Amino acid sequence: MAKKQQSELTTAEKKKQQKRDLILESAKVVFSKKGLIDATMKDIIEECGISRGGIYLYFRSVDEIFLAVLEQRSKRKFDDVREMIMEQVPFETILNKYFSDHRKRLLHSISDGMLRAVYEYYYTHKTEASSSLQQAQLSETKRTIHEIFQVGVQQGVIKDENLAVIAENYMFVIEGLGILALTGHITEQTIDDQIAVMRQLLPYRE
């Protein structure tokens, strides 16, 4: 009997998680189309097909949904790259994948409101919580870059010289390109030129 109850509880929890995921995926579609400022609970309700009361069991506001989307997005971002790091794939392969992912993201951002939504959130929510979230995301970006560099060091491809500073520089360039993408004035050539400059910063072994 206890096992049956446990099984039923697990099934209920799975259904609850599935519904929460559906809300977040639907919200992502809304934010990508409308950004954050113009998105409403009504938009999200219509997109996911869950009643207003059903959504409020999980989230109390658009901002709360957006933060959950942002957290999920942050966790999933560059999952492939992190897996390659864990598997010690050749350094250049990982670096190429990292740049390729950013290139696609930046070019897609021209027509995708999600990046705009992220910056709208940071510019309109001047709170300690939003500041902490932004710092956490920047730190995570820098950490991922530094972990890629460490693979290069371990494989004898690059020297362990000023890598923390270079990782920070990468982070600034990537964030700057993201802001430029919001204006719609970013080009493939601009992205490629900046990636080439970032590569030149690396202390390759001769």
How should these model regions be labeled?
Residues 106-129, 182:
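Amphipathic alpha-helical segments used for helix-helix packing
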Residues 1-18:
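N-terminal intrinsically disordered/low-complexity leader segments
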Residues 1-6, 97-105, 143-155, 171-206:
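C-terminal peripheral helix-coil segments that are non-catalytic and often amphipathic
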Residues 16-19, 141, 163-170, 191:
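Short amphipathic alpha-helix in the helical subdomain of ABC transporter nucleotide-binding domains
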Residues 22, 26, 30-64, 68:
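Helix-turn-helix
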Residues 68, 72, 82-110, 166-170, ...:
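Hydrophobic alpha-helical connector segments
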